[in-house]
């Protein structure tokens, strides 16, 4: 009986280690129309911290107050093996632009991008020598990931079965 209990506990712990822990996203309004979401514990060293600049708040003061966008309620954060991930749902025809200097593509949806400094080498392989963890969506919002770490971005490169915008399945 005692051995069976130990096996069950070990099995449950293994399942917990394999399943990513959902992380609560703490939303805070920074300026009118600008929201900051924090997942987990931010590191001391960050892009905005190193830049040491403050935004020109006069322009923001002219913007109207807006509530937290509905999209924020659909964003899911998780932390597993010391890695933080965000899942931001996209609309069916939504396009993404940005992530730094890219020589061969403007539209980034459907790509896997490795955001760390690298030699371009004449290939559009997701690497760049000028990475920027910021993108703008054709739906009218922008996302900045305030991290100085290497990032891998799956920019709409997959589809979830539970998505309300699941694409039509194709036999390939």
Model regions and ranges:
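Bacterial N-terminal signal peptides
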Residues: 10-17
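Catalytic and substrate-binding clefts that recognize carbohydrates or anionic sugar/phosphate headgroups
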Residues: 24-172
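Sec/Tat signal peptide C-region and signal peptidase I cleavage site
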Residues: 19-23
């Amino acid at each position: 009986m005692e051995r069976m209990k130990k096996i069950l506990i070990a099995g449950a712990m293994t399942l917990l280690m394999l399943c990513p822990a959902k992380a609560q996203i703490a939303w805070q309004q920074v300026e009118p129309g600008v929201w900051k979401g924090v997942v987990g514990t931010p590191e001391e060293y960050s892009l905005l911290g190193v830049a040491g600049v403050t935004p020109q708040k006069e322009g923001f003061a002219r913007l109207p107050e807006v509530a937290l966008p509905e999209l924020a309620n659909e964003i899911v954060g998780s932390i597993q093996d010391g890695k933080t991930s965000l899942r931001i749902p996209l609309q069916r025809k939504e396009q993404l632009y940005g992530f730094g200097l890219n020589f061969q593509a403007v539209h980034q949806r459907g790509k896997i991008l490795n955001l760390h400094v690298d030699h371009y080498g004449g290939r559009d392989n997701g690497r760049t020598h000028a990475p920027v963890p910021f993108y703008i969506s054709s739906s009218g919002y922008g996302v900045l990931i305030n991290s100085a770490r290497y990032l891998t971005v799956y920019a709409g490169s997959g589809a979830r079965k539970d998505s309300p915008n699941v694409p039509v399945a194709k036999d390939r």
